[in-house]
């Protein structure tokens, strides 16, 4: 056992002794309901009205300092923290003894008068205190700077207690999602829920998680996207729908990827990718202004400006700018392979021009996209669910939004031709048979739905986690997910 573990063990022993002493005194250390009428920050903001009045507040003790027959403590709640003042002559010996047994981390209910100390600090003169939860494990003294940052993610409950800025991130995350809902609800969109377990995973290019339903004796997949179900609803006449929910992809973990993540997906009948582009710009800029109060934010040393209109560039033009390749002159698969080789890329056997365009874009362009930028005109080979462009049918009416080198949104004019869709599914199935585990499966029921007739529609997915990262200045996706997926510790492996 390490020295720190020994110290914690000894401290826990002392706290358990205090717990026993409280019970001997007839005090319940794990209290019940407590009616509070004030929060720390509200007391400070309304001090002129509350001075001298008795209030009830509850929260966690974050510090304590005693001087003989008087002492102070800091109490924290969701809104902030406030100083408590304890005096034996006011509380009496028995209740002052309760104060003396306080440990940092204990949760109390407090009744007392609001006043300002001689040093000018707004405080509460405690008249009564109630134990609501005795803390048996001491809080860490130096949590924020831990070298093992994963410990903060593993014990998020402690992270939230000792780091107010972490709490603020998740409060802001909640507000971002609320504002997105409000924006869409106000514009006539209907929030819906679609299956999390699906017999056929679809709607994205990704490796799924597989589970088994015992009663039905069948394999099911945690969804990689809700897209195909949402478009079934468009077929059914629900013309404007959205869903905010989890997706699951059995892939790697990084600062930008977590196996389960939150997406907003939106579909609008009689729209297209340009309608989605405008909606994306309007929605995100409106939420940015509501939540942050400004269209400009600093992120990793860059000042990002969300003021519309955002830059729009075709994928081919973006490649031409970044890599000097003009794919309007490179027409064949062979010439595209040669161009990719010259750039130092490893080219898979049988790679098509469209696949190589996408690969070159990912390798040479994405890292240069800092300010909000719509990249549109993706090859049909990498867009199996998007409508072909009328003028250049080898490309699609699709866009991706990039900010700070990250894909934030993906949208397109939805393919509603069941014959074309089935042909593309067949090509995806061939890729899957060739070893591409991320290629789409055939979904006959979805084809059947399209055969009833789906109106032209625009559809879009926005990555909530990555958007929250930007709006909160968080460098890792694990900073904006309360309980991210983590590698097992050696003792758990």
UniProtKB/Swiss-Prot annotation:
SUPFAM superfamilies: Class II aaRS and biotin synthetases, Nucleic acid-binding proteins
Catalysed reactions listed for this entry: tRNA(Lys) + L-lysine + ATP = L-lysyl-tRNA(Lys) + AMP + diphosphate
One GO cellular component term noted in the UniProt record for this chain: cytosol
Record EC number: 6.1.1.6
Subcellular location: Cytoplasm
Binding-site list for Mg(2+) 1: 400, 407
Gene Ontology biological process terms, A to Z: lysyl-tRNA aminoacylation
Presence of keyword RNA-binding: no
Keywords: Aminoacyl-tRNA synthetase, ATP-binding, Cytoplasm, Ligase, Magnesium, Metal-binding, Nucleotide-binding, Protein biosynthesis
GO molecular function: ATP binding; catalytic activity, acting on a protein; lysine-tRNA ligase activity; magnesium ion binding; transferase activity; tRNA binding
Cofactor binding note of this UniProt entry: Binds 3 Mg(2+) ions per subunit.
One family name in Pfam for this protein: tRNA-synt_2
Cofactor: Mg(2+)
Residues that hold Mg(2+) 2 according to the record: 407
Enzyme class: ligase
InterPro entries per the UniProt record, alphabetical: Aa-tRNA-synt_II, aa-tRNA-synth_II, aa-tRNA-synth_II/BPL/LPL, Lys-tRNA-ligase_II, Lys-tRNA-ligase_II_bac/euk, Lys-tRNA-ligase_II_N, Lys-tRNA-synth_II_C, NA-bd_OB-fold
Entries under NCBIfam families matching the protein: lysS_bact, PRK00484.1
Complexes and interactors: Homodimer.
Family to which the UniProt record says this protein belongs: Belongs to the class-II aminoacyl-tRNA synthetase family.
Name of the molecule in the record: Lysine--tRNA ligase
Organism: Syntrophomonas wolfei subsp. wolfei (strain DSM 2245B / Goettingen)
Lineage, uppermost ranks: Bacteria, Bacillati, Bacillota, Clostridia, Eubacteriales
């Amino acid at each position: 056992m390490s020295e720190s573990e020994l110290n914690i063990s000894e401290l826990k022993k002392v706290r358990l002794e205090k717990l026993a002493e409280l019970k001997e005194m007839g005090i319940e250390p794990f209290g019940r309901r407590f009616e509070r009428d004030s929060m720390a920050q509200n007391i400070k903001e309304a001090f002129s009205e509350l001075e001298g009045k008795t209030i009830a507040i509850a929260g966690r003790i974050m510090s304590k300092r005693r001087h003989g027959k008087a002492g102070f403590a800091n109490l924290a709640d969701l809104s902030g923290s406030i100083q408590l003042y304890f005096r034996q002559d006011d509380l009496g010996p028995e209740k002052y003894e309760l104060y003396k047994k306080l440990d940092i981390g204990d949760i109390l209910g407090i009744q007392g008068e609001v006043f300002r100390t001689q040093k000018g600090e707004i405080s509460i003169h405690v008249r009564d205190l109630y134990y609501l939860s005795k803390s048996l494990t001491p809080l860490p003294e130096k949590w924020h700077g831990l070298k093992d940052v994963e410990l903060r993610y593993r014990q998020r409950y402690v992270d939230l207690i000792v780091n107010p800025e972490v709490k603020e991130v998740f409060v802001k995350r909640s507000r971002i999602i609320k504002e997105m809902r409000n924006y869409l609800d106000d514009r006539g969109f209907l929030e819906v829920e679609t299956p999390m377990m699906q017999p056929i995973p679809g709607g994205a290019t990704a490796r799924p998680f597989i589970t088994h339903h015992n009663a039905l004796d069948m394999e099911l997949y945690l969804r990689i996207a809700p897209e195909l179900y949402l478009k079934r609803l468009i077929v059914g006449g629900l013309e404007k729908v959205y869903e905010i929910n989890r997706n699951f992809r059995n892939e790697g973990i990084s600062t930008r990827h977590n196996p389960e993540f939150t997406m907003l997906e939106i579909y609008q009948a009689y729209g297209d990718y340009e309608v989605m582009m405008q909606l994306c710009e309007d929605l995100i800029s409106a939420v940015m202004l509501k939540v942050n109060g400004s269209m400009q934010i600093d992120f990793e040393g860059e000042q990002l400006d969300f003021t519309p209109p955002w830059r729009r560039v075709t994928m081919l033009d973006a490649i031409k700018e970044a890599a000097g390749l003009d794919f309007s002159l490179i027409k064949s698969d062979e010439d595209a392979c040669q161009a990719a080789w010259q750039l130092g890329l490893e080219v898979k056997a049988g790679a098509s021009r469209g696949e190589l365009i996408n690969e070159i874009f990912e390798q040479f362009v994405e890292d240069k996209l800092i300010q909000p930028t719509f990249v549109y005109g993706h090859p049909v080979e990498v867009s199996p669910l998007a409508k072909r462009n009328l003028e250049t049918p080898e490309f699609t009416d699709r866009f991706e939004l990039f900010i700070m080198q990250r894909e934030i949104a993906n949208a397109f004019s939805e393919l509603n031709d069941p014959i074309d869709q089935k042909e593309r599914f067949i090509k995806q199935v061939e890729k899957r048979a060739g070893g591409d585990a991320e290629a789409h499966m055939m979904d006959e029921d979805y084809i059947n739905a399209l055969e009833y007739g789906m109106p032209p529609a625009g559809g879009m997915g926005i990555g909530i986690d990555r958007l929250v990262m930007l709006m909160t200045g968080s460098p890792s996706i694990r900073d904006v997910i309360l309980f991210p997926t983590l590698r097992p510790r050696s003792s758990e492996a």
